[in-house]
Amino acid sequence: MRQLNRLNQYQRLWHPSAGAPQQVTISELASRCFCSERHVRTLLRQAQEAGWLSWHARSGRGKRGELRFHVTPDSLRNTMMEEALKSGQQHNALELAQLAPEDLRSLLHPFMGGQWQNDTPTLRIPYYRSLEPLQPGFLPGRAEQHLAGQVFSGLTRFNGNSSEPTGDLAHHWEVSADGLRWHFYIRSTLHWHNGDKIETAQLRQSLTALLSQPGMGTLFRSVLRIETTHPQCLTFILHQPDYWLAHRLATYCSRLAHPDYPVVGSGPFRLSVFEPELVRLESHEQYHLGHPLLKAIEYWITPQLFDYSLGTSCRHPVQIAIGEADELASLRLVSNSTSLGFCYLTLKQSPRLSELQAKRLINIIHLSTLLHTLPLNEGLITHTEELLPGWAIPQWPDLTDVALPEALTLVYHLPVELHTMASQLKAYLARQGCELTVIFHDAKTWDGCQQLADADIMMGDRLIGEAPAYTLEQWLRCDALWPHLLSAPAFAHLQATLDAVQSQADERDRHAGLQAIFSRLMETAVLTPLFNYQYQISAPPGVNGIRLNTRGWFDFTEAWLPPPNA
């Protein structure tokens, strides 16, 4: 803050003449800087010693002295930011960057992307919003879910984009013949980010706390208890088989924090700073798997850069630019893919809405031009007719003779694309004689949504992680949507069917069972997918190892920068 005050005072001195020499009195300068004459003399002396200006006073009260400037405020700001970053004072650098968006873009350009700072390879990412606090358990945002996987470790993990779990804190595991006892063998050289050695008893304590969370208790409903059966072994004892257990433990929500320090993990990066305007990760020197190639990752929270009217390339949270978005020429698209995750529409059948009417609504969505004419940025979404690859939506005959209800209620939550979808659907149904009441739940999940009970139609999105089929099983088990969407008997039957599917030791049988469940939901017009996103990551030259993962981010441990002048 002291540097920012010095810069602001310098700008006040500079501004009246735009840097031209000035003939001015000490009294006028003090008034300009909102300070005493004594203080402005100190200010002039310090600025002159720093080489910013020259002040030639004339003897006698009220005499005009000569003020000459040697640096512009912009160059001084850049120098101050460089000095702040070299000394590890990221907060001071961000304070110095408090400018209008169009000026901020050009100012931040030299500092974003990959930089070697004090011989430390650092990657800086401008981001459009503050991040929610990190904690084990379910997290609403894609960025937070990705960060949880970089900061915390689990007993198992997904390696890259593989859908099969592999060892993490546990190097191997074994399952009893009846599927009711799972032994996880814990590595002997594990350390928390604070340097403490990880004890197996701590992992048991963290797991027990995690499973006490309501949503996590639902996910692990088959677990009877967890025991430390050896200093290097955790044993899960189940009351019914669950062959998804290793998958459940590998997902981001099952990562473990220190039982006494909830932000201390054991993943490849530790949290150094976590504040609304800055998040800094630093590599964990005692990480038990492959060490990161970067020393630090920083999120600079600069929402003003992401205003559509400014024309930045970071138009949407699924399109990440590592580096300053205004310099399109220097950024290159390094990775892109179509997400398996999707936005969806569900319909609650009731005396107000029959199955046949629900089918006609789904036909309207997929057979009309509705999805193809959404006024969204080109290349952002792709209309889909599959829930997952190979899980196609059903085809029904023309149902235009089926009368729609006179009135229906739609409730939807983020992402923002569903604003457009809701508006288009409301206008279309009005032309069909159906009045659609639209209610927006301003959140990323259905948690806490009071309007679900009265909704006929719901829209939201479903992120697909590393194991697509398993992720959908987790959705059916844990999302607040389904108890409101289905009748009590239908929901109980769904949960019993999921229990039967999870008891199949062969993964192909489990996948087939899940596909049958979702095929039934689509065939009975309860669920239909709408569109997928196009994930994109752009980076400036010299930032390497960037490869999209299933969450639309990239593994921070794989990114690297060549040394300067190499």
Walk through the language-model features, giving the residues of each.
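Surface-exposed binding/hinge segments that line
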Residues: 66, 216-261, 266-275
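N-terminal lobe/hinge region of extracytoplasmic solute-binding protein
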Residues: 126-175
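Aromatic- and charge-enriched surface segment that lines or borders ligand/interaction sites
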Residues: 19-22, 41-43, 140-142, 172-215
